[in-house]
A protein has these predicted regions:
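Enzymes that bind and transform nitrogen-containing heteroaromatic metabolites
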Residues: 2-153
């Protein structure tokens, strides 16, 4: 499951964060996976990001409207969230990447290998990311926060 989150970074527009859980081999974890249940329910997982959101983006959200909203003076501190957990929402992730709307990615890396499934970061626009912060939890899950440093042409 992946989540998208806008936050006010103190700049002239809202920032967008992608929040996702993925396996070591890059696939979306199954919803009934024990470690995924922790990510979805623990206050150090997705609930933290839900508490800090105002609006929710869904698949088929008009990205051109989002571009305008992001630069609007009245929306500088608005917080939007979207969960990316299926093929439709993966398309939203790809669209956000295509328009370079992602400023930060928070990845919950689950210490399991599925071998097959829905890839989280397949077909995204090439870009470079810097590690901002990492946290490892007692259950083996590692949260890695990446910040976008540039678009690769």
């Amino acid at each position: 499951m992946t989540t998208l989150f806008f936050t006010d970074g103190g700049n002239d527009m809202a920032k967008i964060q992608i929040i996702t859980a993925m396996t070591l081999d890059g696939f979306l974890p199954k919803a009934d996976e024990n470690l995924m249940q922790w990510v979805m329910n623990d206050d150090k997982g997705f609930p933290y990001w839900h508490e800090h959101s105002i609006y929710r983006l869904m698949p088929h959200y008009p990205l051109l409207d989002l571009l305008a909203e992001r630069h609007s003076d009245k929306n500088k501190s608005d917080i939007y969230i979207a969960e990316i957990s299926d093929t439709q929402s993966i398309e939203l992730l790809r669209g956000l990447s295509r328009y370079n709307l992602i400023d930060e990615m928070v990845v919950y890396l689950l210490p399991i290998v599925l071998g097959k499934g829905t890839p989280v970061f397949d077909d995204l626009t090439p870009s470079r990311w810097n590690v901002h912060k990492t946290t490892t939890f007692p259950n083996g899950i590692t949260r890695i926060i990446y910040r976008n440093s540039c678009i690769l042409q």
